[in-house]
Amino acid sequence: MRLDTIINHDALCALRELPAESVHCCVTSPPYYALRDYGMDAQIGREDTPEQYIARLVEVFRELKRVLRPDGTFWLNIADTYCGTGSKGAYTDPKNPKGRNGQSLSLARRAAGCKQKDLIGIPWLLAFALRSDGWYLRSAIIWQKDNPMPESVRDRPSRCYENVFLLTKSKSYYYDAAAIAEPIAPTTAARYRGGRSAGHKYDGEVPGQGKVQGINRARTGGYYDEALMPTTRNKRDVWHINTVPYKGGHFAAFPPKLAETCILAGCPKGGVVLDPFFGSGTTGLAAKSLDRHYIGIELNYDYCTLARARIGGETN
């Protein structure tokens, strides 16, 4: 199997050519439903109904499950959309309101049981469909964007997040919590240093770590202080990651930090990271920077060319 390479092909067909249980991790963001037009035959995202869209993705990710190692992880970034007429000015791609190629989109968005202006619920419909297809649904992460795309709506809150689901092939899998651990809050550190009085909520223990001898005594420094006081905590499921402008021709690239976080947690060094919707190659760029191998699959030849130039050093 070739590594550090980009395959210009349909995702499903390309996945069928990969060996079983050959990749450690998948990080991907498939085309969102009815929000943009690649201008390509066989593209995903232009189906007549959400049900058809989800069925196609389930089929692709079923083949991904075959390719993924038993201890592998699958990180899926997906956003929602609204039911509407598809007229100009309706809900558009949160990453690029004018479409991938600068065109204004006018796509009908219809869903069974949904009224015009209803939020369809695409992320959770897909997550539940994947769970029914045998995936373990392990975490629903909120990618919180503190610099979101402005919206002109006045009858609902503006959107500022997308979903990232962690799915796995098995109930036991590779996950490096320490690699993405967060520093504890300054107030928490101060509380540890100062000790606690008897009867405190966490009397004699560090939250999440159980009883620790001497936790109620004030500590003034030295090796005792360092050994006793934790400096990090398990990463929470709300990730504050800003979008990053990209000057290339692919306007829907997610930020490298998002891909890096998933890869650090879900793929060992030297492992193989797969992205079946490679786009401009953010996943490959992140994998390479973290000493992991990558395999990218992308339907659009122009994006393959863009990704190769962006990543550099492709071996195949």
Where are the regions a protein language model picked out?
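Core catalytic lobe of class I
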Residues: 1-316
